[in-house]
Amino acid sequence: MFSGSIVALVTPMRNDSVDVHHLRELVEFHIAKGTHALVAAGTTGEAGTLSHSEKLLVIKTVIEQAKERVPVIAGTAMNATKDCIELTQQAMEYGAHAALIMTPAYIKPTQEGLYLHYSHIAQSVAIPIILYNVPGRTACDMLPETVARLAKISNIIGIKEATGQMTRLQQILRLCEGSIDVYSGDDLTAAQWLLAGAKGVISVTANVAAKLMAKMCDLAMDDDQAGCLRIQEQLMPLHELLFVESNPIPVKWAMNKMGLIGGELRLPMTELSEKHHQALEKVLKNLELI
């Protein structure tokens, strides 16, 4: 249903409010660069510090600006199942093509709790759902066996798996037997995952190197292994520097350098440490992004 380079959009801020003007411009930027789909109000979009109404504003703005030219996937993760259902229903009413739902953070549910959380959501909304496993940020790891159980639910259609572990991809593909699409959630290993059967990548790097990420995914889908890996090698210094501090700190700094957004973050996120400025600027210049 969704494939290729799927950007995890940042949320531009101005005076501690959502910068709708620059958010609309980002949608146009990605469509022009060939990005295949957009994620609104996800982790990279600072969803953890957005209010409920701000999340809806971001989702609605991206959907309206995209005008059906590319699919829009709404980040609707909430820790409480009932709250997640409510937000997902609202995103569906705005016209989101799917919902990306991260595992609950901090509360550390059991595997059965995860199964019940997602199955209740899926039964309550008529929209495709993409699971999202990122244990490095949530302290919650959804195991492949749980994914396989959830894959039997008709509107659970994919998983963003951010561990970057090739064995995890192989386990999910084997257990789910094609009943669910897998998306890389780790830019550093995305090319290898694409060539091993992942459907796409939900990418931080695509915020900056949109055209190259889209090309890398196109080459992978065309089974051009050499071409795909060549672009991945070219992008590796950027991938690494975009995670020298917590996402989206580095990517917002880079986008500010590129003139795409103002670069403002919401506390407790802070600006990129000065010690990383020179290296990231050099990589952006090497890639002819500034």
From Swiss-Prot:
Domain of life: Bacteria
Marked site: Part of a proton relay during catalysis: 43, 106
Gene that this sequence comes from: dapA
Assembly with partners or alone: Homotetramer; dimer of dimers.
UniProt name for this protein: 4-hydroxy-tetrahydrodipicolinate synthase
GO molecular function terms noted in the UniProt entry: 4-hydroxy-tetrahydrodipicolinate synthase activity
Reaction(s) this enzyme catalyzes, per UniProt: L-aspartate 4-semialdehyde + pyruvate = (2S,4S)-4-hydroxy-2,3,4,5-tetrahydrodipicolinate + H2O + H(+)
Localization: Cytoplasm
Entry binding sites for pyruvate: 44, 202
Pfam families found in the cross-reference section: DHDPS
HAMAP family: DapA
Statement: the UniProt record of this protein carries the keyword NAD: no
Database matches in InterPro entries: Aldolase_TIM (IPR013785), DapA (IPR005263), DapA-like (IPR002220), Schiff_base-form_aldolases_AS (IPR020625), Schiff_base-form_aldolases_CS (IPR020624)
Gene Ontology BP, a term: diaminopimelate biosynthetic process
Organism whose genome encodes this protein: Legionella pneumophila subsp. pneumophila (strain Philadelphia 1 / ATCC 33152 / DSM 7513)
Active site feature: 132, 160
Known EC number: 4.3.3.7
GO cellular component terms given for this protein: cytosol
Family: Belongs to the DapA family.
Keywords: Amino-acid biosynthesis, Cytoplasm, Diaminopimelate biosynthesis, Lyase, Lysine biosynthesis, Schiff base
Pathway: Amino-acid biosynthesis; L-lysine biosynthesis via DAP pathway; (S)-tetrahydrodipicolinate from L-aspartate: step 3/4
Chain segments annotated as transmembrane: none
Function: Catalyzes the condensation of (S)-aspartate-beta-semialdehyde [(S)-ASA] and pyruvate to 4-hydroxy-tetrahydrodipicolinate (HTPA).
Leading EC class: lyase
Entry-linked PANTHER family: 4-HYDROXY-2-OXOGLUTARATE ALDOLASE, MITOCHONDRIAL, DIHYDRODIPICOLINATE SYNTHASE
